[in-house]
Swiss-Prot record:
Keywords attached to this entry: 4Fe-4S, GTP-binding, Iron, Iron-sulfur, Lyase, Metal-binding, Molybdenum cofactor biosynthesis, Nucleotide-binding, S-adenosyl-L-methionine
Functional note: Catalyzes the cyclization of GTP to (8S)-3',8-cyclo-7,8-dihydroguanosine 5'-triphosphate.
Residues annotated as binding S-adenosyl-L-methionine: 27, 68, 119, 189
Cofactor note: Binds 2 [4Fe-4S] clusters. Binds 1 [4Fe-4S] cluster coordinated with 3 cysteines and an exchangeable S-adenosyl-L-methionine and 1 [4Fe-4S] cluster coordinated with 3 cysteines and the GTP-derived substrate.
Gene: moaA
Binding site for [4Fe-4S] cluster 2: 250, 253, 267
The protein, known as: GTP 3',8-cyclase
Subunit structure, as described in the record: Monomer and homodimer.
Length: 323
């Protein structure tokens, strides 16, 4: 069992396989060109798997593949099959923007993928293009349809932005409700790489919009293993809101992140990291596990978004850590 310095059980590993992304979303990616990490500096699938295998042996129950955009890395289904074949009952999931998903969904499902989280901030073509800096909506919707068709469990992630997509909150909710998908609205997490002036809706503003049509929704008892607070409409449909600005958001954090370069990240907000790259490439797996335990001991109690200070902006590059 893996325990951090505050007694929290850590059983969830998020693995970024690439920092590259084919979108330039306002809340995540810088607009100006910059240098990607050279591909030869990334851990191979084999080395990533060595660490995942050891982490599972130490008590990890859930593995999520992230990016950047993970579907940009070739042979991702091969990598997922490696993990699935080692531990068939592992909770194996993927986070994606959905743009390439229609061609990959069946391969991923056949490889052992169980669930997929897909970003959908709007159902308006022009708004989607404004957010992603690219014409994306049609292909994202095709990806969602194909993932559903092949039997992947789907959650939709939506980051409502003030003055951009706040008018689309109800439409996204209705889209998911009609298809039986869970939707989670995510408060914008201020970060160094977001577009200047980007502002998100807070949880109260999101709830106020939903209450315009569904005034009698109620709060659901929180599942401490989930970052979202869920709410239930009168017909039983549940939606979630992820609230990183709330004081208790980090209280039950159960996750650790591994970047494609081999850095272990204890917290999405902070820059602190330690590398397991040399250890896994040298097959010193015990050393990699010791680094993991050391990183967990350094895991902070909470992020700084909860201080409700507009100056608290994370310098973490979210596209490298998968959010």
């Amino acid at each position: 069992m893996l325990i951090d310095g505050f007694g929290r059980k850590v059983d969830y590993l998020r693995v970024s396989v690439t920092e590259r992304c084919n979108f330039r979303c306002q809340y995540c990616m810088p607009e100006k060109p910059f240098s990607w990490v050279p591909r030869e500096n990334l851990l191979s699938y084999e080395d990533l798997f060595k660490f995942i295998k050891a982490s599972i042996d130490e008590g990890i129950k859930k593995v999520r593949i992230t990016g950047g955009e993970p579907l940009l890395r070739e042979d991702l289904d091969f990598f997922i099959k490696m993990v699935f074949d080692y531990k068939k009952d592992i909770d194996l999931a993927l986070t994606t923007n959905g743009y390439l998903l229609s061609k990959m969904a069946k391969k991923l499902k056949d490889a052992g993928l169980k669930r997929v989280n897909i970003s959908l901030d709007t159902l308006n073509k022009e708004t989607a293009q404004k957010i992603a800096q690219k014409d994306v909506l049609e292909k994202v919707l095709e990806g969602i349809e194909e993932a559903s068709k092949v039997g992947l469990k789907i959650k939709i992630n939506c980051v409502p932005l003030k003055g951009v997509s706040e008018k689309d909150v109800l439409e996204v909710l209705e889209f998911c409700k009609s298809r039986g998908f869970v939707v989670r609205f995510i408060e914008f997490m201020e970060n160094f790489h977001a577009k200047d002036g980007a502002k998100g809706l807070n949880s109260d503003e999101i709830k106020a919009i939903i209450a315009q049509k569904y005034p009698n929704f109620k709060t659901v008892l929180r599942d401490t293993s989930s970052p979202a607070q869920y709410y239930e409409l009168e017909d039983g449909y549940q939606f979630g809101i992820i609230e990183p600005h709330k004081d208790d958001f980090c209280a039950s954090c159960n996750r650790i992140r591994l970047t494609a370069e081999g850095f272990l990240i204890p917290c999405l907000y902070f820059e602190d990291a330690m590398s397991i790259k040399n250890a896994v490439q040298s097959n010193k797996i015990d050393e990699a596990v010791e680094i993991l335990k050391k990183v967990l001991k350094n895991k902070p109690e909470k992020n700084k978004w909860s201080q409700k200070d507009d100056n608290e902006v994370s310098t973490r590059a979210f596209y490298q850590t998968g959010g």
